[in-house]
From Swiss-Prot:
NCBIfam families attached to this UniProt entry: PtuA
Top-level taxon: Bacteria
Protein name per Swiss-Prot or TrEMBL: Retron Ec78 probable ATPase
PANTHER family (UniProt xref): ATP BINDING PROTEIN (PTHR32182:SF23), DNA REPLICATION AND REPAIR PROTEIN RECF (PTHR32182)
CDD domains per record: ABC_ATPase (cd00267)
Biological-process GO terms, alphabetical: defense response to virus; DNA synthesis involved in DNA repair; double-strand break repair
Functional note: Probable ATPase component of antiviral defense system retron Ec78, composed of a non-coding RNA (ncRNA), a reverse transcriptase (RT), this protein and a putative HNH endonuclease. Expression of retron Ec78 confers protection against bacteriophage T5. At multiplicity of infection (MOI) of 0.02 cultures slow growth when infected with T5 but do not collapse, at MOI 2 cultures enter growth stasis.
GO molecular function, one term: ATP binding
Motif annotated as ATP-binding, chain positions: 93-100
Phylogenetic placement of the source organism: Bacteria, Pseudomonadati, Pseudomonadota, Gammaproteobacteria, Enterobacterales
Keyword entries, A-Z: Antiviral defense, ATP-binding, Nucleotide-binding
Transmembrane segments: none
InterPro entries: ATPase_AAA_core, P-loop_NTPase, Retron_ATPase
Length: 550
């Protein structure tokens, strides 16, 4: 069996290499130090290795991403199958089609990776027999089946979450061992020697909840690396969470020397006053305390300097990501001169407090900042931690965003977080106009939920006009059919055809209505004038042909 593992490991199989590392570590502590090191480095290199592409961006040699999802009797779906792109997948469909349910199915699956990175045998989110099983499910259970890809040495990581309905005699267990096996590798290798870890996050529409800042002082709280996974898949990205964390980080980077040094300073000051008051007997003690204070300060400066650099860089990266992605913001900082902690930004050249930003800016800022914070904590070995890998789910990416910002949102996210697999939902044709059709997954408009296969649209969306995308991809007419004014131009064209291109009283009246309603510089009036010219030209040509035929 060992030979078989060795053959697979040398062929690039990650699970086999890790099995050999574990065997040599657990069962042959004396023998296999070299073997242990060999298989450990094989695993670590598989996870860590990467290259810099032509644009100067770090790319992992072994990408990790969700490849396929199948839902069976999950919520509204009898059966749904969807394939994902490695970099970006955008899901579109009418309200109630189940876009958000797809994101929650993925989030529940990802939670099993997170739970087992944090501790051996951890349990992730389970399906609910109350809310996740289709009401009329024939088999009385729900399945969420996922397949992940992690490089050529681990092409398929299949996971299935299952749940039987209440009162069902037969139990249906989930199959999560592959998730635990992979998470074990990340956890064990990281424990032996720090590695970069994947980021997983869900940003749901609740991120738009009103700003409710907690004003208590959190400067003394302790920030651990694995806090990056805290609440990551529960709809992260609340604005008040970011403000609290950012003020904490700011205070950490400018914090005073430790309390022990403050005590030494107080003792030195007290002794100095005694000596100055004539107590010569404590002069030698004063010199000893001064020396102790000097040595303690030097040690503290060295330790604090190292930690402050880390936190200072962390803060700088988050600030840079915000200014790169969030529209109109060029600077962000903490203002403390007023006696209270205020996060301020330069917005379109004006300094304002962060709670004075628009809803769209606040919502998007908190998402970007939250994601950047998590990636900085999980990727300490990367020169740019935002080039770490991971899977990020965003519901309604266009939430509160101005149309101009919708044109930039995905482009900016992909630029700042180049190795994240984004899985996104949207209702915005503007967003769709910025991405290739290969990245879009649409529901069949006639789908009744019994059997769904999400696929790419026929039309190329990137660079296309919004009106085309609305009509050909989203099956929505660019102008509302229930609005009478939207039909005037078509009615006008029909009148011209009926009257051989001439304006009679009825067509003239309709022309005047178009001119008055839409305005003299409107595209609608220009189209009406163009129709008149074209029909006059056709009429003239027809007359010439008629005369030649006599």
């Amino acid at each position: 069996m060992t030979k078989q593992y060795e053959r697979k490991a040398k062929g690039g199989n990650l699970l086999s290499a890790f099995e050999l590392y574990q065997r040599n570590t657990d069962n042959m502590p004396g023998l296999g130090e070299m073997l242990v090191d060999e298989w450990f480095e094989t695993c670590r290199d598989y996870i860590q290795d990467g290259h810099v592409d032509e644009s100067g961006t770090f790319r992992p040699d072994n990408a990790f991403y969700l490849r396929r999802l199948t839902l069976k009797d999950f919520r509204r779906f009898s059966l749904l199958e969807i394939k994902f792109e490695e970099d970006l997948t955008v899901i579109i469909g009418n309200n109630g089609k189940g876009k958000t349910s797809i994101l929650y199915a993925i989030a529940k699956t990802l939670s099993w990776f997170v739970a087992n990175i944090l501790k051996e045998g951890g349990s992730g989110q389970r399906l609910s027999e109350l809310t996740d099983i289709k009401n009329d499910a024939e088999n009385r259970y729900a399945d969420v089946s996922s397949t992940f890809f992690f490089g050529k040495g681990l092409k398929s990581v299949p996971i299935r979450l299952s749940r039987s309905a209440l009162g069902t005699a037969e139990r249906r267990d989930s199959e999560v061992k592959p998730a635990r096996d992979l998470a074990d590798i990340w956890r064990v290798i990281n424990e032996a020697k720090t590695i970069n870890l994947p980021t997983f996050a869900l940003y749901n529409v609740e991120r738009s909840q009103p700003f409710n800042r907690n004003t208590k002082d959190n400067a003394g709280r302790r920030e651990e690396r694995f806090d990056a996974y805290s609440q990551a898949l529960g709809g992260a990205g609340r604005f008040d969470h970011f403000v609290e964390w950012y003020i904490y980080l700011h205070k950490r980077t400018i914090s005073d020397i430790s309390s022990s040094i403050k005590e030494l300073e107080q003792q030195v000051n007290d002794l100095q006053r005694s000596v100055d008051g004539g107590m010569v007997s404590v002069k030698s003690l004063l010199e000893q305390m001064k020396l102790k204070l000097s040595e303690a300060s030097e040690r503290n400066d060295a330790a604090v300097s190292s930690k402050m650099v880390t936190e200072s860089v962390q803060k700088s990266i988050v600030e840079k990501s915000i200014c790169s992605v969030v529209p109109s913001i060029s600077k962000i900082w903490v203002e403390m001169t007023t006696g209270s902690d205020l996060v301020k930004v330069t917005n379109d050249g004006h300094d304002v407090t962060i709670d004075q930003l628009s809803d769209g800016q606040r919502v998007f800022l908190s998402l970007v900042a939250d994601l950047a914070r998590r990636m900085v904590m999980l990727n300490p070995l990367l020169e740019n931690p935002l080039e770490g890998r991971g899977i990020v789910l965003i519901d309604e990416i266009e939430l509160h965003l101005h149309p101009k910002w919708q044109q930039e949102v995905i482009l900016n996210l992909r630029s700042v977080f180049p190795n994240i697999q984004f899985i996104i939902t949207t209702h915005s044709p503007i967003v769709l106009s910025t991405i290739e059709k290969r990245c879009i997954r649409e529901f069949d408009p006639n789908d009744d939920g019994n059997q769904s296969f999400l696929d790419s649209p026929d039309m190329q969306t990137k660079g296309s006009e919004n009106a085309q995308i609305l009509e050909q991809v989203m099956n929505v007419h660019p102008t509302p059919p229930g609005i009478a004014e939207s039909h005037w131009l078509g009615d006008f064209e029909l009148l011209l055809l009926d009257n051989s291109g001439e304006l009679d009283n009825q067509s003239q009246e309709l022309y005047d209505k178009i001119k008055t309603h839409f305005g003299i510089d409107s595209a609608e009036l220009k189209k009406a004038d163009s129709l008149i010219r074209i029909n006059k030209m056709k009429n003239k040509i027809n007359k010439i042909r008629a005369e030649k035929g006599k």
